[in-house]
Design a protein with these regions (language model features):
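Proteins that catalyze or organize thiol-disulfide redox chemistry
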Residues: 1-51, 57-63, 67-80, 90-91, ...
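Conserved residues in the N-terminal Rossmann fold of short-chain dehydrogenase/reductase
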Residues: 83
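Hydrophobic anchor residue in the Rossmann-like NAD(P) cofactor-binding loop of oxidoreductases
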Residues: 86
Length: 135
């Protein structure tokens, strides 16, 4: 028997709408997102765990890390992955005390919880990120 919607639970409708909004927002940030002051805070709020790669155009090791970040973004769809060019956004880099490049900061619930400086193997970075997904 088909439902005409009259007997639908309003609480279920509210939850479905909230989930749809959440998924739509996450789709906006799929893959590795180029971050700026315009979208940085919103990006962190969108994901329970977010990873930000701080880089610069003159930094050769940063370009070695980029494919690792891209692979992790494909393999870990529940985690937000972003890259922030420190030359274009020095204020954000300074806010998080980024002194060396590349620096990867892992955020949980919008707060920095871990930091990796330099190029590291994918497995090491992946394990560090997974540690914040478990609780």
């Amino acid at each position: 028997m088909a439902s005409n919607g009259a007997d639908r639970d309003p609480e279920i409708d509210r939850l479905l709408e909230a989930k749809a909004r959440e998924l739509t927002k996450k789709m906006k940030y799929s893959g590795v997102v180029e971050l700026s002051k315009e979208n940085f805070d919103d990006f962190l709020k969108t994901f329970r765990v977010a990873v930000v790669d701080f880089w610069a155009t003159w930094c050769a090791p940063c370009f070695m890390l980029e494919p690792i970040i891209k692979r992790l973004a494909l393999e870990m769809p529940d985690v937000g992955f972003g890259r922030l060019n420190t030359e274009e956004e020095p204020e954000i880099a300074a806010k998080y005390y980024v002194m060396s490049l590349p620096t990867v900061i892992i955020f949980k619930d919008g707060e920095p919880v871990d930091q990796v400086v330099g190029v590291v193997p994918k497995k090491i970075l992946q394990d560090r990120i997974k540690a914040y997904l478990e609780d």
